Amino acid sequence: MIEASRAHAHAALAEPHRLAIVDALALGDLSPGELGERTGQSSNLLAHHLGVLESAGLVRRRRSDGDGRRSYLTLAWENPIVAATAGHGVAPHGARVVFV
């Protein structure tokens, strides 16, 4: 069962649009509209790819704390595949963050 789950997650990530979604969410939670703007995907294409990522256990949807009508997408960081994959397309290799 674990192998099937891992295979499902890797298959979900084997598509450039879905990797772009994961990379965008690596920087923080986004609403579907914000995510569409950031990745340049139409709403119907984005909905399809989010469905695939959600069914693979890589992305979760949560309601806004302040306004229950709005939803946000977040990465399932507890999934080791997300932790190993997310953000690789965000910053060039060797980039560093300095806190002052």
What residue spans do the PLM features occupy?
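Amphipathic alpha-helical dimerization/coiled-coil segments
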Residues: 1-5, 23, 76-100
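N-terminal helix-turn-helix DNA-binding core of bacterial DNA-binding proteins
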Residues: 4-45, 68-80
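Amphipathic alpha-helical interaction segments
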Residues: 18, 56-57, 80, 85
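Single-residue recognition of alpha-helix boundary sites
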Residues: 29, 60, 85-87
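Alpha-helical residues within the helix-turn-helix
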Residues: 37, 54-55
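Short, hydrophobic-biased segments on the C-terminal half of alpha helices
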Residues: 50-51
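Beta-hairpin "wing" of winged helix-turn-helix
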Residues: 55-71
